[in-house]
C-alpha cells in the first residue's frame, strides 16, 4: 500500500530525497503482487519510479492518482514498462488471497481512497489520509455508509490516519475556503494577488480560479509541480478552467496588477520553491512588489513554521 518518499532534514547535506528501503521486497519478490495506492501526494507516490526499477509490479489507483503516477513514470521513461490499472470507487481487485476494495474518502487532494482488504483472516481497513467533508467542492463526500457496513460485518484491524488527532474539534469543509477567497479578492481590488498553496490541492486551485473569473482576473501559474498537476487535473476533468483564463507568466506585463492572480508553490517556505525565489528576487520571471497581496493558503506542516 502506497510508495512514497520524504524530504531530508536540514542537516542531511547533499541528499535530495529519501526513499524506502526495498530490500525485503526484493528478497520476497515472489510474494509481491502489486502496489495499491490511496492518493497522489508525494509521500504516497513519490518513490514509485525508483522502487519500480527494483520491484516492477502492477499499480492500482484511482483516476487522478494514476494520472499523477503516469506523469512521474514519463519523466523516468518507464511508462511502457509498468502495468497500470485505474480503479473506481466501490470496485475491487483480487491479488493472490486478498481482495482489495477502494472506498471514497476526502482529503486535500481529489480521488483519495481508503482500502478494505478482505483476507482469509478477516477484514482489514486502511483509511489512507482522510477527513470527513460533507460538502466537498467536487460534490463527492466520504462514503461513511460503506465504513458502517464494514463495521457491521466485523473488522479485524483498522489502520487509521491520525493527523491532528490530538487537536480538539473538526476540520472545516474545503468549500468554506471559497468565501475567504471572495473576501480577499474583494478587499484587494487594486493589488496583484499571489496565492501560495499545495500544488496537489486541486479543489483549492479550482476555488482560486473561480474567484479570479468572478473578479475578472487572469491567472498565472508558477512552480514546476503546480504547473504539472494543473495540466494533469485539467486533462482528466478534475479542474475546470474557462478559456482565456490562464496566461503565461511572461504575458503579465500586458496587464495591470489588479488584473492578475498568481498561483504558486512555496506555501511551506521551501527554499527552492517559486514563492521563496520571488521574495528573494531570485525568480527569473516574477518578483514580489510593494502593494502585492501575498496569501498563504495552507497551514504550516509541523516543523516548517520557521521556514514559512
Q: Residue locations for each model-derived region?
A:
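His/Asp/Glu-rich metal-coordinating catalytic cores
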Residues: 1-36, 41-255, 270-287, 301-308
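Conserved acidic residues
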Residues: 33, 156, 260, 292-295
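Residues in well-ordered beta-strands of folded domains
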Residues: 101, 263-264, 295
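Conserved two-lobed SF2 helicase motor
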Residues: 259-268
